[in-house]
A protein has these predicted regions:
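Mature N-terminal segment immediately following signal peptide/propeptide cleavage
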Residues: 1, 5
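Enzymes and membrane/adaptor proteins characterized by extended Gly/Ser/Thr/Asp/Glu-rich
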Residues: 6-127, 155-168, 194-202
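Conserved, mostly hydrophobic/aromatic
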Residues: 12, 45, 91, 134, ...
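Loop-centered beta-sheet repeat module
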Residues: 124-154, 175
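Flexible, glycine-rich surface segments
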Residues: 150, 176-202
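Extracellular glycoside hydrolase catalytic/binding regions
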Residues: 167-175
Length: 202
């Protein structure tokens, strides 16, 4: 509490180790917000599928999604919007106002060890439409979406948590594929930059 009063902290990210139970989480987020001298962004990684800190915690009886890819397979953005609405509703209930989702990557590299089914599609247009709809669903519940991982993690062969991920695409190639979901008319307010090197661009 003293730290939040003393320093102008702007945001908090809750990881799995911080999440024990529904009542604990709701209380913790409220205490953080109440203690802070500055209104906080309180965020979590809740993509649905493999990355879902709340839904994948057995202490929470929340809807679970197989993956973004499973949702994207329908080709109907309304399915992604419904996913965003569902996730947004329960994040709001537990005191979150920001989600580090949706994943806006285009899953073009079958050897990618970290994105895979976290992406809505291997088709850029489909990924863009789905990510935009999911983001809108989150916003409808007052949750700030964060499209990730700019400039595109889908065509890398490395897990950026353990090594430097590299895309060898040119700026033109990125613009025609990976960047499309980030340039779509999403009304987005936040983008997460990936730990990705682009030697043919920079």
């Amino acid at each position: 509490r003293r730290t939040l009063q003393q320093y102008p902290v702007g945001g908090i990210c809750q990881f799995g180790k911080n999440i024990e139970s529904p009542s604990q989480l709701a209380r913790f987020n409220k205490e953080l917000q109440d203690a802070s001298a500055t209104p906080l962004f309180i965020a979590v990684d809740e993509e649905g599928g493999l990355v879902a800190r709340l839904a994948n915690n057995d202490a929470f009886a929340l809807p679970r999604y197989a993956s973004a890819a499973a949702v994207g397979a329908s080709g109907d953005p309304e399915d992604a919007r419904a996913m965003g609405q569902t996730i947004g509703a329960y994040l709001k209930e537990y005191g979150f106002n920001m989600d580090f989702a949706p994943d806006a990557d285009v899953n073009t590299n079958p050897d990618n060890p970290i994105i895979g089914s976290r992406a809505f599609s291997s088709d850029a247009g489909t990924a863009a439409a789905m990510a935009a709809a999911a983001a809108d669903g989150l916003r409808q519940n007052g949750i700030l979406p964060t499209l990730k991982h700019f400039p595109g993690h889908g065509d890398t062969a490395e897990d950026s948590h353990t090594a430097l991920a590299v895309t060898y695409k040119t700026q033109e190639e990125l613009a025609n594929c990976e960047l499309l979901p980030f340039g779509a008319d999403t009304g987005l307010h936040a983008v997460m930059v990936g730990h990705i090197a682009a030697p043919n661009v920079t």
